[in-house]
Amino acid sequence: MPSMKDKTEETKNRIIEVAKRHFSEKGFDATRIHLIAKDVGVNKALIYYYFKNKEAILDHLIQTLLNDLSKIIMAFTKDNIIAMIKEGRLNIRDGHWRFMSEEDAGNFYEAGLRHCENMVDFVLAHRSVIRILVFESLKNGKYKNAIFRFLNLLHDKGKEPDSTNILNTDTDFKYNVDNFVFKFFFGFIPLFNFAAYYDEYAKSSGIGERELRASFMRCYEKM
């Protein structure tokens, strides 16, 4: 028999999932708490017990997305970049990545492709939240700057969160403005747009979802 704690967590998760669907389908502004409560099968008071308002629900969705995406990026950095530097197989100097052998370069390239696959799978799995985020960022409302929270994945007071670890490993490592701009506009934004428009593009173009994903991967790998 589920414990009270388990039931409480289950109810909270149901609220989050239903709210996510409403936000994605109707838009954040058009979504009403009483409609979320009706679909969940609870009264409004219970929703307010877990969340102060619908903004708090969206904040939770965005922060969870941010945290999970950060884990993927940090894991790749630790398992590949930092590991190769420590093993003497990679040296980063003046923005140039120097591998000690062609084999090392090839191994890193393959790891990078797997990382791209993981990132694409992640944004597609969370495309309903990303769709909300992208559309809300285009409005002149509270969440117009929400997408820029992801800049914190690129830098924190001028430094990338994982760049500190790289710098501690390789003192020649430097990060500049071009790196930040490239990662945001040619890294995150294409991924977010792909996820946000994935379903509608598949319907409009007649391309199957599997082929659409494969086509995007081929294009993304060239960037």
State each model region's role.
Residues 1-10, 21, 81-85:
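N-terminal intrinsically disordered/low-complexity leader segments
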Residues 14, 18, 22-68, 79:
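Helix-turn-helix
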Residues 61-111:
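Amphipathic alpha-helical linker/stalk segments
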Residues 64, 132-136, 186, 190:
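Short acidic/histidine-centered micro-motifs embedded in hydrophobic/aromatic stretches
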Residues 64-68, 72-79, 122, 126, ...:
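Phosphate/oxyanion-binding loops and surfaces in catalytic or ligand/nucleic-acid-binding neighborhoods
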Residues 82, 86, 121, 125, ...:
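C-terminal peripheral helix-coil segments that are non-catalytic and often amphipathic
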Residues 104-107, 111, 115, 146, ...:
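Soluble or luminal CAZymes and related metallo-dependent hydrolases
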Residues 109-110, 114, 118-172, 181-182:
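Amphipathic alpha-helical packing segments from all-alpha helical-bundle domains
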